[in-house]
């Protein structure tokens, strides 16, 4: 494995080489296998989203399929948790939140060229379990040569998709961001939130 690198700037944490490429390949395969059986969700239909706002397909980890996720993605999530613990410790969030953070549902998203979540937004709202979102994280599952960045409005920052790259940031203002459309190929990410009890 290459040397792990960490860059935390303005509480936006970028972690490289924590997750192996083969772990990312397993996540993509998990998504594609579920898509064959129509187990993925189109956001235009499921969220009544405008095609100009959100356009991608998602596969959620829920109570009915959690075993499949854990069997396939356990090494990835254990490596992610190492990055998360580093982030929480080095930003002061671990003390501030006094261990009241917990995971919520995971999802894998596939975005085709020119699609994506184009609208500037923040994640600070109640999630599906009616608990407040504290942090957002994304794991890029493949390289994108052109486009597909996570862009932060108030920090003039774009994070390029790179296989295995982890990005963690606070869910609230001023972390206004968007997912720029991938231009050179399909984009896969695993994404979710850390919730506050």
Where are these regions (language model features)?
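Fe(II)/2-oxoglutarate oxygenase catalytic core
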Residues: 1-166, 174-197
């Amino acid at each position: 494995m290459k040397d792990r690198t960490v860059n935390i700037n303005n509480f936006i944490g970028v972690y490289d080489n924590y997750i192996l490429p083969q772990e990312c390949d397993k996540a993509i395969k998990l998504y594609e296998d579920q898509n064959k059986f129509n187990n993925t969700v189109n956001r235009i239909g499921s969220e009544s989203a405008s095609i100009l706002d959100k356009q991608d397909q998602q596969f959620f980890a829920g109570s009915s399929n959690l075993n499949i996720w854990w069997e396939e993605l356990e090494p990835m999530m254990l490596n992610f948790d190492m990055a998360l613990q580093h982030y929480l410790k080095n930003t002061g969030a671990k003390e501030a939140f006094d261990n009241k953070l917990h995971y919520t549902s995971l999802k894998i998203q596939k975005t085709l060229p020119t699609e994506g979540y184009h609208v500037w937004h923040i994640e600070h709202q109640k999630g599906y379990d009616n608990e407040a979102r504290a942090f957002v994280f994304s794991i890029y599952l493949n390289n994108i040569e052109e486009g597909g960045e996570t862009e932060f409005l108030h920090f003039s920052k774009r994070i390029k998709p790179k296989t295995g790259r982890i990005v963690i940031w606070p869910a609230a203002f001023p972390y206004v961001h968007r997912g720029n459309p991938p231009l050179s190929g399909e984009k896969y990410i695993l994404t979710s939130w850390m919730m506050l009890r």
